[in-house]
Amino acid sequence: NWKDTFSSADSTRRQYDYATSLHSSQVYTPQLIVNGKHVVSAGSPEKLLKVISDASAAPALPVAVDAALVGGRLVVNTGGGSGEANLILAIFDESETVKVERGENGGKQLTYHNAVTGLRTIGMWKGKALEVELPRKEYLTEKGQGCAVLLQRITQQGTPGEIIGAAVVSGTGS
């Protein structure tokens, strides 16, 4: 079998945590989680498009999140609301082409967009407006990287829950 270029122990652990949260008996790759609430196989493009379309048509996420580069810092601001959530920074490669050695895509070159290469909790949100500043060079080290900031509830089991706010900053790498 071909090894997934973007796999990591952390990603696998997160997939199993989502399986617990979403009461799913399956973990597979590639797997997409939409807004922390819906699990979809990338092998089901029609279903994926429907889930994304439905999520896009739903009311906006309830908590405003803004992220911007200011000088050498990434500055994140959230609005207020109710409950608690983790503030998570997701680092991604905006575009990466990989030659697949084996498997159903063996011999092909596939281009991935926005493949997450790192996740880190950067704060705890307690329902009040929050500002977090991070040194850009500590998190965004390579050209072609971007980041997303997710405000994500945690379930009673301690697993990832619903995303209640989000922001994206593209083209942020060195």
Place the predicted regions along the sequence by residue.
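Ligand-binding face of N-terminal immunoglobulin V-set domains in extracellular IgSF glycoproteins
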Residues: 32
